[in-house]
Amino acid sequence: MSTPSVQTFGKKKTATAVAHVKAGKGLIKVNGAPITLVQPEILRFKVYEPLTLVGLDKFQNIDIRVKVSGGGHVSQVYAIRQAIAKGLVAYHQKFVDEASKNELKKVFASYDKTLLVADSRRMEPKKFGGRGARARFQKSYR
């Protein structure tokens, strides 16, 4: 029989990250590379947020593998952190107990709601008569 696992996803704009969480020995990989190599370096701590919020002891006995595609660098980082947080909550709900799941959800929600809930904002399409969605070209009366 295969090891018990859960699959969750995180989204930001057009970036999608799929996380597979299963029992293991504490490996966390993003697109096959360790989480310590996530680029850009400035946003690496954003990916670490779910880990630091609940403590590394919760990650000692699970492996997380994340595949991310689409979007830009920043969107991918936010999708990764959401997938990891949702994966941890789903794993605790399915294989640990309800109390620890509720505790994790409370910690994540109090820190940043987007760790568990997707940001639904999208880019507004450009219209004619201006440079962007709302900006208009300057009007001259003479």
Swiss-Prot record:
The keyword Ribosomal protein applies. Pfam families: Ribosomal_S9. It comes from the Eukaryota. Keywords: Ribonucleoprotein, Ribosomal protein. GO terms for molecular function: RNA binding; structural constituent of ribosome. One of its GO terms (cellular component) is cytosolic small ribosomal subunit. InterPro entries: Ribosomal_Su5_D2-typ_SF, Ribosomal_uS9, Ribosomal_uS9_CS, Ribsml_uS5_D2-typ_fold_subgr. The keyword Zinc does not apply. SUPFAM superfamilies: Ribosomal protein S5 domain 2-like. GO terms for biological process: maturation of SSU-rRNA from tricistronic rRNA transcript (SSU-rRNA, 5.8S rRNA, LSU-rRNA); translation. NCBIfam families: PRK00474.1 (NF001749). Belongs to the universal ribosomal protein uS9 family. This is Small ribosomal subunit protein uS9. It comes from Debaryomyces hansenii (strain ATCC 36239 / CBS 767 / BCRC 21394 / JCM 1990 / NBRC 0083 / IGC 2968). The lineage of its organism: Eukaryota, Fungi, Dikarya, Ascomycota, Saccharomycotina.
